[in-house]
């Protein structure tokens, strides 16, 4: 009798353990599936862009790039101040052509403040990604205040320019090697030697590849990166290269760069900045 009772308890215990194991396995599978289904968050912030500024609007000249990104990112757009609350859950932050002056009779745009620098530095060092896009002259570009932020990562914009170029990137270039960059004119990035964020050029201006239009061809970095703390920063010296007309190869300013891989370059940069692995690409690869 006692033996039968003991065997019954053993069977019950075994069934209970099996049920718990299956439950735990199911929960783990669901969690893994949910994690895989969640896309990294890309925030296109318009906070530093002046009210009334028509360049690079999310439903304008940046509509196509943001539409494509939605296939791999949870793309969000807003003009709210950048702080701990608005950056919560954001994997990569995009800032394009921050405005210097007011547009028309609108209020002047916000410039980077000490509080912003603190919040954004913490965000990046704790694992966030930042992509900042500069530009050429006459684009209402603000760099003085923005550089105070970028210098935290050993990077800074300059007022030295290079005209439109069709750049074949060396195959050994990390992340974007072997691709063709349609570069539509911009400034240069300086890097600070020995900085703890490990700033370095990713794309140096290849003087052997001549401008398609214009004569400015300044040696230096057209795209530079840094890795402060657990985060990733990419600073690019042109904002028009991911606009609708650049991606469609209609061209900008009367110059059309054919065969460019601008979407694939930005896609890879966005994944690198977000700390995620890029899936199979949709255009040319190495």
Where are these regions (language model features)?
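Short intrinsically disordered, low-complexity coil segments enriched in acidic
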Residues: 1-2, 104
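Bacterial N-terminal signal peptides
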Residues: 15-29
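Bacterial N-terminal signal peptides that target proteins for export
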Residues: 2-17
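Short, surface-exposed patches at the edges or C-terminal ends of soluble domains, predominantly
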Residues: 32-286
């Amino acid at each position: 009798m006692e033996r039968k009772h003991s065997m019954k308890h053993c069977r019950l215990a075994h069934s209970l353990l099996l049920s718990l194991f299956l439950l735990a396995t199911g929960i783990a599978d669901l969690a893994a599936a949910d994690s895989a289904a969640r896309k990294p968050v890309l925030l296109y912030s318009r906070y530093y862009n002046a009210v009334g500024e028509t360049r690079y609007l999310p439903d304008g000249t940046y509509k196509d790039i943001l539409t494509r990104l939605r296939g791999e990112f949870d793309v969000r757009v807003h003009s709210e101040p950048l702080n701990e609350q608005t950056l919560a859950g954001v994997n990569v932050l995009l800032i394009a052509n921050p405005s210097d002056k007011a547009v028309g009779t609108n209020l002047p745009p916000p410039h980077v403040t000490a509080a912003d620098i603190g919040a954004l530095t913490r965000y990046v060092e704790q694992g966030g990604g930042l992509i900042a896009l500069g530009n050429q002259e006459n684009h209402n570009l603000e760099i003085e205040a923005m550089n105070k932020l970028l210098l935290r990562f050993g990077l800074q914009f300059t007022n030295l320019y290079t005209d439109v170029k069709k750049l074949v990137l060396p195959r050994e270039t990390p992340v974007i090697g072997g691709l063709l960059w349609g570069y539509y004119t911009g400034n240069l990035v300086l890097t600070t030697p020995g900085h703890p964020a490990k700033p370095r050029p990713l794309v140096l201006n290849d003087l052997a590849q001549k401008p398609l239009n214009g004569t400015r061809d300044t040696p230096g970095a057209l795209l530079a990166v840094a890795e402060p703390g657990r985060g990733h920063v990419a600073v690019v010296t042109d904002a028009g290269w991911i606009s609708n007309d650049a991606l469609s190869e209609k061209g900008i300013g009367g110059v059309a760069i054919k065969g460019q891989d601008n979407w694939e370059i930005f896609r890879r940069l966005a994944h690198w900045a977000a700390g995620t692995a890029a899936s199979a690409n949709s255009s040319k690869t190495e």
